[in-house]
Each structure stands twice: as C-alpha cells, then as structure tokens.
C-alpha cells in the first residue's frame, strides 16, 4: 500500500510538472494523426499562422497565436480541436510510456506512429527550458533490438533552433506517404538547424512570401549499403504567400561514402 501511495504521489508530481509551462522549447514530432488534423483545422481558422506541412513543428509556432481565440467565436468542433491541442502542449518535464502490439507489421508506414515489430515498448523522457530541449525516446522490441530513434537535443539561437539527434521528419501534405521524407525509414543521426516560428520577412522584396520556415540538416547513413556511410543532406523551404495556400520547396543530396 505504501508503495502504491508513493507511486501515485510520483505520478501526481510528474503530471504537475508536465503542465507547468506552455512556453517550453520543444517540437511536435510526426506520429500523431489526431494532432496533425487539429493543427490543420486551427490553421484554417487563423489560430495557427504559417506553413503546417513540415514536421516536426515547433510548439512555439503552434501556440503563438492561441491568444486570438479569446476574441473569436468558434464553431464547437473547432473549440474542441483548440482544447485538444492546448492540452497536448508539453510542459517542462514530460515522461510517457507506450506499448505496441501488432498481428502484422506494416511494410509501409503512414503519419501515425506504428510499431516496427509485433511487440514494442517505447519510453519518452523530455526536459524543456525556455530555449533548449532534451528529448530521449527509447524503444525495445521483441527482436531484442534497442534504439533511440526520435531522440534529440536542441538549442534556440534567436529564431532558429540548432539540433543534433535522430529526428523523425515528414515533409509534405500526404497522409499515408510523402514524395520526399517520411517516417517509413528509421531516422538517421543528423545535425541541423530549423526556424522556430514563421514570422514573414519585413523587407518589401521578400514580404510577399508571407510566413515562412526552413530547415537544413546533414546526416550520415548506415554502413550496410552498396556505398557505405554516405552523407545525406536535406533542405526545405515552406512559405504561405496567401492564407491557406502553402508552397514547399525541398532538395536532398547524397554525397561521398566509402568505396
């Protein structure tokens, strides 16, 4: 009984910590289709500004216009979506566990987070500060494989976030797959930089682009391939010149490698 009370107390403390801050520096990673649908709906109603088709998305970008809801009369279903997203906003400390069981492992993965084996356990621990975030995501499956896919360390520098880790990415509006980067393959160790919030350019020469974001990263691919350990470079620019009309430009390169 004492152990149960201690466990309940610990869970209560974790819960309190996890909702203690809504301004933490972290990302919403691909893997939650419900969150993505809500984000796209809120963007349509003006509660989220800027591009929404590249994931991960900064939580600061997602929530920075939420204050507008106080002066808006929203349909009931939009209010529900707003509350769901707000409740998912991470706090300073977050600890989660999740178990997966699948009778058949999917050969192709969509946006939703799915197991890569029949049985899989995932644990997530996250610490968010005003300008830095440490996200540890550990997975163990029935093949006795352990990995840290989805883990990263990020630090904001002005309106940019520099990061290192194995980051899952989803570039494009597709729901089941994308033409560039998706979560179908495991993420590669990478180092990169991406924009935090999508404020438009102030200069008259580029202000026509509207809200914009960008990312560039460099990864090292695996050894077990025809050309071992090549360097993989990815770049993407998204901008919204007209409300709810988003343009995405992306480029990937594979360089070097051992022979």
Placement of each model-derived feature along the sequence:
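Residues that define the transmembrane beta-barrel architecture of outer-membrane proteins
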Residues: 113-121, 144-151, 156, 184-194, ...
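Outer-membrane beta-barrel domain signature
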Residues: 51-52, 107-114, 137-142, 179-182, ...
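Transmembrane beta-barrel strands of outer-membrane/channel proteins
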Residues: 95-103, 136-140, 164-168, 214-220, ...
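Bacterial N-terminal signal peptides
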Residues: 10-19
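Short loop/turn motifs that connect adjacent beta-strands in outer-membrane beta-barrel proteins
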Residues: 51-55, 84-95, 128-134, 159, ...
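Signature for the C-terminal beta-barrel architecture of outer-membrane proteins
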Residues: 190-259
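Transmembrane beta-barrel domains of outer membrane proteins
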Residues: 124-128, 153-156, 194-196, 238-240
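N-terminal periplasmic/intermembrane-space "pro-region" immediately following the signal or transit peptide
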Residues: 24-112
């Amino acid at each position: 009984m004492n152990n149960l009370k201690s466990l309940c107390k610990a869970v209560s403390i974790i819960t309190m910590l996890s909702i203690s801050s809504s301004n933490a520096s972290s990302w919403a990673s691909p893997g939650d289709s419900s969150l993505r649908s809500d984000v796209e709906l809120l963007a349509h109603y003006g509660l989220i500004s800027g591009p929404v088709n590249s994931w991960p998305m900064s939580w600061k970008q997602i929530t920075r216009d939420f204050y507008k809801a106080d002066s808006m009369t929203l349909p009931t279903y939009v209010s529900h979506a707003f509350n769901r997203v707000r409740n998912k906003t991470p706090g300073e400390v977050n600890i989660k566990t999740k178990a997966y069981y699948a009778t058949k492992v999917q050969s192709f993965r969509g946006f939703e987070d799915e197991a890569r084996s029949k049985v899989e356990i995932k644990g997530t621990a996250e610490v968010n500060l005003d300008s830095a975030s440490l996200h540890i995501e550990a997975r163990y499956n029935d093949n006795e494989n352990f990995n840290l896919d989805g883990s990263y360390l990020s630090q904001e520098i002005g309106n940019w976030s520099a990061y290192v880790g194995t980051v899952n990415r989803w570039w494009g509006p597709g729901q089941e797959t994308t033409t560039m980067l998706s979560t179908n393959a495991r993420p590669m160790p990478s180092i990169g930089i991406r924009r935090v919030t999508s404020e438009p350019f102030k200069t008259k020469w580029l202000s026509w682009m509207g809200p914009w974001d960008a990312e560039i990263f460099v990864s090292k691919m695996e050894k077990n391939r025809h050309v071992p350990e090549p360097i993989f470079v990815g770049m993407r620019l998204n901008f919204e010149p007209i409300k709810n009309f988003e343009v995405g430009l992306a480029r990937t390169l594979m360089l070097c490698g051992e022979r």
